[in-house]
């Protein structure tokens, strides 16, 4: 398993602790650019860490869990019969949005007055590179998704969002560096996937109901003890919603 954007290895710890058969003779490679975050990742048998995804030769699965929505993207605005790039300018010591050069949209979509769309070339390039790194296996992407056409019909602040201290922030140009900027992923701008599904269906197909039932039984039997197994059982129930 190769996890891109693994951070401190929270997901890696959970996956390895579950003891999946696919890792009995394999390794969980945590890919994280930040040296600070890599320093907090788990180590030992079953774990490996790197700043980069291997160029090729991977047999297994590459996982991107809420990675693509954080990659750099462009923003296009409809202006008459064309699309134009949205840039950032300075006006009276304030950062403002400025319509700049004409741009071709990433997919074939007509400009409609007031419409805006993302240009997610970085996400498309990352996905292509991840697929090319696989000799045998699959790429699993988990993210908030939409389509370019669908986003063009919605207010931009519904799919281009900012967060500060785990709460929704202000405009993307407000207080640079103080808030995270995230965007829904337009799946029609990525290489065509083999299949897509929503998170609920994916979890049910892969046995979430059985795992929750097992956790509920563990919690019922060991709640009075309050040991780690009991806490894990309760966590399954709570996190499954």
Question: What feature does the model see in each segment?
Answer:
Residues 59-60, 137:
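Conserved acidic residues
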Residues 61-112, 153-164:
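A mobile, often basic/glycine-rich helix-loop segment
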Residues 6, 67, 142-146:
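Short, well-ordered beta-to-alpha junction loops that form the rim of enzyme active sites
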Residues 5, 62, 190:
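A residue-level signal for conserved active-site and pocket-lining positions in enzyme catalytic cores
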Residues 5, 32, 65-66, 214:
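Glycine-rich, histidine-containing beta strand-loop boundary motifs that form or position
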Residues 1-58:
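SAM cofactor-binding core of SAM-dependent methyltransferases
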Residues 104-241:
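Long, Lys/Arg- and hydrophobic-enriched amphipathic alpha-helices
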Residues 38, 71-72, 149:
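Conserved protein kinase catalytic core
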């Amino acid at each position: 398993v190769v996890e891109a954007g693994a951070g401190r290895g929270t997901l890696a710890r959970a996956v390895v602790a579950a003891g999946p058969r696919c890792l009995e003779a394999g390794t969980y490679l945590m890919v994280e650019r930040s040296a600070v975050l890599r320093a907090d990742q788990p180590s030992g048998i079953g774990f490996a860490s790197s700043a980069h995804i291997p160029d090729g030769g991977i047999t297994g699965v590459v996982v991107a869990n809420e990675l693509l929505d954080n990659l750099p993207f462009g923003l296009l605005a409809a202006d008459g019969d064309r699309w134009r790039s949205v840039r950032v300018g300075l006006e009276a010591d304030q950062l403002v949005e400025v319509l700049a050069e004409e741009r071709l949209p990433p997919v074939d979509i007509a400009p409609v007055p007031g419409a805006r769309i993302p240009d997610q070339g970085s996400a498309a390039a990352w996905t292509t590179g991840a697929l090319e790194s696989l000799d045998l296996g699959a790429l699993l992407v988990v993210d908030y998704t939409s389509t370019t056409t669908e986003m063009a019909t919605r207010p931009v602040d519904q799919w281009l969002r900012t967060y500060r201290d785990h709460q929704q922030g202000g405009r993307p140009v407000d207080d640079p560096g103080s808030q995270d900027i995230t965007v829904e992923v337009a799946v029609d701008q990525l290489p065509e996937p083999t299949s897509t599904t929503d998170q609920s269906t994916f979890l049910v197909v892969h046995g979430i109901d059985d795992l929750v039932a097992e956790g509920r039984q563990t919690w019922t039997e060991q709640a009075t003890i309050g040991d780690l197994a009991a806490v894990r059982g309760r966590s399954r129930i709570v996190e499954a919603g």
